[in-house]
Amino acid sequence: MHFTQREQDKLMLVIAADLARRRQQRGLKLNYPEAVAIISFELLEGARDGKTVAELMSYGKQILNEDDVMEGVADMLTEMEIEATFPDGTKLITVHHPIV
């Protein structure tokens, strides 16, 4: 089986998000890459589920809060952009201040 670079990137994101969720479930606060992985994964899955870009932009702010992440992570993550595949094509999702 051969995966394109884009497919490999998505698989790595799934693995990173899964590891981050496991750490979160153990009560650990998430670092920057873990927070980005979880939010990105949830946005990609939302697109796959048929949510609109506007819905995902709003949802992106509800996935994590400051209590979920290490000190300073929310301040570092001021904007996220992720390209997701929707039923009508690929679109860019931008979430401003995803961790509140």
Curated annotation (Swiss-Prot):
Notes on temperature effects: Optimum temperature is 55 degrees Celsius.
Keyword Cell inner membrane in record: no
Subunit composition and interactions: Heterotrimer of UreA (gamma), UreB (beta) and UreC (alpha) subunits. Three heterotrimers associate to form the active enzyme.
Segments forming a coiled coil: none
GO cellular component, one term: cytoplasm
Organism the protein comes from: Staphylococcus saprophyticus subsp. saprophyticus (strain ATCC 15305 / DSM 20229 / NCIMB 8711 / NCTC 7292 / S-41)
NCBIfam families given in the database record: PRK13241.1, urease_gam
Family of this protein: Belongs to the urease gamma subunit family.
pH influence on activity: Optimum pH is 7.0 in phosphate buffer.
Catalytic activity: urea + 2 H2O + H(+) = hydrogencarbonate + 2 NH4(+)
Keywords assigned by UniProt, alphabetized: Cytoplasm, Hydrolase
CDD domains associated with the record: Urease_gamma
Name of the protein: Urease subunit gamma
